[in-house]
């Protein structure tokens, strides 16, 4: 039940876009087409669902203070948390590279439409942010970290597909010239963020 609460909260309450404003570059640049946005969103879900649990295990058994005591008691005082950023980024980059090769092989049309934004998932701050938030929240099991990673990815997917659908609908609307493009996208993001704030009253026991 606790994992379910973490999963739902990471989608609607601690949404990467609306609560933390993470991953905004690709969110704004790619969200002009629902199909492309959905493809990128699924890729982000995949990367987060894999990297967050892996980085959780890395933190618990390698990086944190005393994590290496499982090897031998002499390593009980070793603290490798200064390597957190380097190793987290290495894991993320490796998973993204594998994902890029798979997408290019099996869905070349999606690969072409995503362009540079697919490999840039490796430096998407939402991906790194999820692993760092996971570390900060100090989850008690790999299942909880998986729920958080999967939920964070789905939350980002909902955000980018939602705004892409709205931007497609207003494409032929009369929008003031000064607000066209990024301007109206920011306004829409703010309105969607306000809508997601309605979930703040939900509590999990």
Write out the residue ranges for each language-model feature.
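Ordered, amphipathic secondary-structure segments that act as subunit-interaction surfaces
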Residues: 60-114
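Helix-coil boundary and interhelical linker segments in multi-pass alpha-helical membrane proteins
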Residues: 1-4, 60-82, 131-146, 205
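Cytoplasmic-side transmembrane-helix entry/capping segments in multi-pass membrane proteins
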Residues: 36-46, 84-88, 110-121, 178-184
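Interfacial loop-to-transmembrane junctions
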Residues: 168-186
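Structural signature of hydrophobic alpha-helical transmembrane segments
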Residues: 5-18, 78-92, 147-159
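Generic transmembrane alpha-helix signature in multi-pass membrane proteins
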Residues: 21-29, 100-106, 117-120, 125-139
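Hydrophobic core segments of alpha-helical transmembrane domains in multi-pass membrane transport
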Residues: 22, 26, 44-50, 89-98, ...
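C-terminal ends of transmembrane helices
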Residues: 22-36, 96-110, 163-174
